[in-house]
């Protein structure tokens, strides 16, 4: 059976666990006498082999406030691990990523609160998530979560960060708790039609997102608020096709694809000079993608697709047009002859005539008709960056090939 094959690949071995424990021993020594806990998928037993990020939360009394976490707590943590390979990262507040033996450990300062619904920062709920999941999943349930995570990774809908807008690890755990197993999740997801409500607890507010899973530890929060409609639809379609024809391709899609260039494709390569929060950068990139598409359409280009990919330092924006060539002049459609606005139209336009339909027309010159210039002008990054741009002729870049192909390998 496909699932059993996949599980053999993704389920950690005893050796894997020992390797993680050795890393944790180093962290425990450094954080000695602090109030800390191991959280996340490792603690819950739902982690995937060779895909391990350990979450360690250092708790401080809630009375010290959020500002204390950003300054005092962070400095205290850095002083304890400063001789290790570490970097600063940013979410709601800064935290530290330590790399030990190729294992990333996120050390996150948080406030110790009485319950999940009393959270002051988003991470304060985490220990309550851990308790909820570990009390509702047995060993088989943990394996079912692993299968669901790998399936979502394979089809590209895993990860709640803004760059992906997909399902978080916690969301996958709740789906298994609610439906019972991997196959049952797929059976139900294949029938989804938004808005979808999955209630392990009664919500404490009205949610407007397409997929609603009220957080069992804080019912005022929707666990899947970040999941885009695109990713919900992708997951539903993938579930339907997997149930019809199970294949390992859903879990581990083919990396090498080939596709010819259709239309005209502009590639923009951005290299960021400054480090910034991933969510901040990708918020600006997503706004840039939308702005580029809107501007090109406004100037008369027929846009096939605009997408972006990369990390926080190197980003590619690909713009696919039916054609990059567009006329310098265009037909401007005016009002009907009886409209009160005809005088204004006549005053503002040249080359005016009355059409067979009784409507006024004119010829107008486009303010801009170079697609590359328009695209560059509509990048809204607030950090400094260098840009390289070119029109695609051919490529061996697999990300660009994926963009050109469109169809996921699991679909066809």
UniProtKB/Swiss-Prot annotation:
<comment type="similarity">
    <text>Belongs to the tRNA nucleotidyltransferase/poly(A) polymerase family. Archaeal CCA-adding enzyme subfamily.</text>
</comment>
<dbReference type="Pfam" id="PF01909">
    <property type="entry name" value="NTP_transf_2"/>
</dbReference>
<dbReference type="Pfam" id="PF21133">
    <property type="entry name" value="CAA_C"/>
</dbReference>
<feature type="binding site">
    <location>
        <position position="41"/>
    </location>
    <ligand>
        <name>CTP</name>
    </ligand>
</feature>
<feature type="binding site">
    <location>
        <position position="129"/>
    </location>
    <ligand>
        <name>CTP</name>
    </ligand>
</feature>
<keyword id="KW-0819">tRNA processing</keyword>
<dbReference type="InterPro" id="IPR042090">
    <property type="entry name" value="CCA_tRNA_nucleotrans_2"/>
</dbReference>
<keyword id="KW-0692">RNA repair</keyword>
<keyword id="KW-0548">Nucleotidyltransferase</keyword>
<keyword id="KW-0067">ATP-binding</keyword>
<dbReference type="GO" id="GO:0004810">
    <property type="term" value="F:CCA tRNA nucleotidyltransferase activity"/>
</dbReference>
<comment type="function">
    <text>Catalyzes the addition and repair of the essential 3'-terminal CCA sequence in tRNAs without using a nucleic acid template. Adds these three nucleotides in the order of C, C, and A to the tRNA nucleotide-73, using CTP and ATP as substrates and producing inorganic pyrophosphate. tRNA 3'-terminal CCA addition is required both for tRNA processing and repair. Also involved in tRNA surveillance by mediating tandem CCA addition to generate a CCACCA at the 3' terminus of unstable tRNAs. While stable tRNAs receive only 3'-terminal CCA, unstable tRNAs are marked with CCACCA and rapidly degraded.</text>
</comment>
<dbReference type="Pfam" id="PF09249">
    <property type="entry name" value="tRNA_NucTransf2"/>
</dbReference>
<dbReference type="GO" id="GO:0005524">
    <property type="term" value="F:ATP binding"/>
</dbReference>
<comment type="subunit">
    <text>Homodimer.</text>
</comment>
<keyword id="KW-0694">RNA-binding</keyword>
<feature type="binding site">
    <location>
        <position position="53"/>
    </location>
    <ligand>
        <name>Mg(2+)</name>
    </ligand>
</feature>
<dbReference type="InterPro" id="IPR011068">
    <property type="entry name" value="NuclTrfase_I-like_C"/>
</dbReference>
<protein>
    <recommendedName>
        <fullName>CCA-adding enzyme</fullName>
        <ecNumber>2.7.7.72</ecNumber>
    </recommendedName>
</protein>
<dbReference type="InterPro" id="IPR008229">
    <property type="entry name" value="CCA-adding_arc"/>
</dbReference>
<feature type="binding site">
    <location>
        <position position="55"/>
    </location>
    <ligand>
        <name>Mg(2+)</name>
    </ligand>
</feature>
<feature type="binding site">
    <location>
        <position position="158"/>
    </location>
    <ligand>
        <name>ATP</name>
    </ligand>
</feature>
<dbReference type="GO" id="GO:0000049">
    <property type="term" value="F:tRNA binding"/>
</dbReference>
<dbReference type="InterPro" id="IPR002934">
    <property type="entry name" value="Polymerase_NTP_transf_dom"/>
</dbReference>
<dbReference type="GO" id="GO:0001680">
    <property type="term" value="P:tRNA 3'-terminal CCA addition"/>
</dbReference>
<keyword id="KW-0808">Transferase</keyword>
<dbReference type="GO" id="GO:0042245">
    <property type="term" value="P:RNA repair"/>
</dbReference>
<keyword id="KW-0547">Nucleotide-binding</keyword>
<feature type="binding site">
    <location>
        <position position="106"/>
    </location>
    <ligand>
        <name>Mg(2+)</name>
    </ligand>
</feature>
<feature type="binding site">
    <location>
        <position position="44"/>
    </location>
    <ligand>
        <name>ATP</name>
    </ligand>
</feature>
<keyword id="KW-0460">Magnesium</keyword>
<dbReference type="InterPro" id="IPR048833">
    <property type="entry name" value="CAA_C"/>
</dbReference>
<feature type="binding site">
    <location>
        <position position="149"/>
    </location>
    <ligand>
        <name>ATP</name>
    </ligand>
</feature>
<feature type="binding site">
    <location>
        <position position="129"/>
    </location>
    <ligand>
        <name>ATP</name>
    </ligand>
</feature>
<keyword id="KW-0479">Metal-binding</keyword>
<feature type="binding site">
    <location>
        <position position="158"/>
    </location>
    <ligand>
        <name>CTP</name>
    </ligand>
</feature>
<feature type="binding site">
    <location>
        <position position="149"/>
    </location>
    <ligand>
        <name>CTP</name>
    </ligand>
</feature>
<dbReference type="GO" id="GO:0000287">
    <property type="term" value="F:magnesium ion binding"/>
</dbReference>
<feature type="binding site">
    <location>
        <position position="44"/>
    </location>
    <ligand>
        <name>CTP</name>
    </ligand>
</feature>
<feature type="binding site">
    <location>
        <position position="41"/>
    </location>
    <ligand>
        <name>ATP</name>
    </ligand>
</feature>
<dbReference type="InterPro" id="IPR006116">
    <property type="entry name" value="NT_2-5OAS_ClassI-CCAase"/>
</dbReference>
<dbReference type="InterPro" id="IPR015329">
    <property type="entry name" value="tRNA_NucTransf2"/>
</dbReference>
């Amino acid at each position: 059976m496909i699932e059993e094959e996949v599980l053999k690949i993704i389920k950690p071995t005893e050796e894997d666990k020992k390797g993680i424990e050795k890393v944790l021993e180093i962290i425990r020594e450094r954080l000695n006498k602090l109030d800390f806990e191991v959280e996340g998928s490792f603690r819950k037993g739902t982690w995937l082999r060779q895909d391990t990020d350990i979450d360690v939360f250092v708790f401080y009394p809630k009375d010290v406030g959020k500002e204390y976490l950003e300054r005092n707590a962070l400095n205290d943590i850095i002083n304890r691990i400063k001789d290790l390979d570490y970097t600063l990262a940013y979410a709601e507040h800064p935290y530290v990523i330590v790399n030990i033996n190729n294992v990333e450990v996120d050390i996150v300062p948080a406030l110790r609160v009485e319950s999940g619904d009393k959270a002051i920062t988003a991470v304060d709920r985490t220990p309550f998530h851990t308790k909820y999941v570990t009390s509702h999943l047995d060993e088989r349930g943990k394996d079912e979560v692993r299968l669901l995570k790998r399936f979502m990774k394979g089809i590209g809908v895993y990860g709640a960060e803004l760059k992906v807008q997909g399902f978080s690890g916690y969301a996958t755990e709740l789906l298994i708790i609610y439906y019972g197993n991997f196959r049952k999740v797929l059976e139900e997801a294949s029938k989804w039609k938004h808005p979808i409500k999955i209630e392990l607890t009664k919500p404490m507010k009205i949610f407007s997102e397409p997929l609603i899973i009220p957080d069992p530890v804080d019912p005022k929060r929707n666990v899947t608020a970040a999941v885009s409609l695109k990713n919900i639809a992708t997951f539903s379609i993938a579930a339907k096709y997997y149930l019809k024809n199970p294949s390992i391709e859903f879990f581990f899609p083919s990396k090498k694809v080939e596709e010819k260039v259709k239309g005209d494709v502009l590639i923009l390569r951005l290299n960021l000079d400054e480090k910034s929060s991933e969510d901040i950068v990708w918020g600006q990139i997503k706004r840039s993608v939308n702005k580029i598409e809107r501007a090109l359409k406004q100037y008369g280009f027929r846009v096939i697709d605009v997408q972006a990919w990369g990390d926080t330092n190197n980003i590619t924006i690909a713009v696919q047009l039916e054609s990059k060539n567009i006329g310098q002049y265009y037909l401007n459609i005016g009002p009907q002859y009886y409209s009160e606005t005809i005088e204004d139209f006549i005053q503002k336009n040249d080359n005016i005539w009355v059409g067979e339909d009784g409507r006024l027309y004119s010829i107008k010159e486009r303010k801009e008709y170079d697609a590359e210039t328009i695209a560059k002008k509509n990048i809204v990054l607030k950090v400094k960056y260098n840009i390289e741009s070119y029109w695609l002729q051919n490529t061996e870049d697999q990300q660009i090939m994926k963009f050109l192909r469109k169809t996921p390998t699991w679909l066809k």
